[in-house]
């Protein structure tokens, strides 16, 4: 399965992270509901039970034990916990990367500085550029999937 439009999703048990009962659910929960895939969805709290170790791992453990057939999970969580399961699990990005204009599945991470701090921003940009191989190595060690940008975006003024 590589797409939220894959017909198999209508027949398998799907684990999805849910945020709460206020309608502010995860993009995968909304995307599946838009496709009328709801009867075979099992919800797992994004927050988990912090009285237990690694509460966000429950959804990945459910795939490993067969409690669900597939899970649609944020990439860093999926990759990190999939690596420690007793059975081999495969983590693949799903498409589309944006289900609707307001429902992204890919998220940028940014670093902000105060207005007028151009020298500080330039220093941080240079450090990040210089340390990019180290940052990528650490992300690889933790199994964090990434979508590479063609080039860094310009700063917002």
What function would you assign to each model-found segment?
Residues 1-157:
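Proline/Glycine/Serine-rich low-complexity intrinsically disordered segments
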């Amino acid at each position: 399965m590589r797409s939220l439009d894959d017909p198999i999703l209508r027949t398998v048990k799907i684990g999805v992270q849910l945020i709460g009962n206020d309608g502010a659910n995860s993009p995968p929960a909304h995307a599946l509901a838009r496709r009328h895939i709801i009867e075979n969805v099992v919800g797992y709290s994004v927050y988990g039970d912090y009285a237990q170790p690694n509460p966000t791992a429950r959804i990945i453990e459910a795939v490993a034990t067969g409690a669900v057939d597939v899970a649609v999970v944020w990439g860093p969580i999926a990759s990190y916990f999939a690596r420690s399961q007793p059975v081999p699990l495969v983590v693949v990005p799903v498409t589309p990367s944006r289900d609707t204009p307001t429902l992204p599945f890919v998220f940028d991470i940014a670093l902000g500085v105060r207005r007028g701090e151009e020298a500080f921003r330039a220093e941080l940009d240079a450090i990040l550029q210089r340390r990019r191989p180290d940052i990528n190595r650490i992300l690889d060690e933790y199994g964090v999937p990434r979508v590479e940008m063609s080039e860094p975006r310009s700063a917002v003024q």
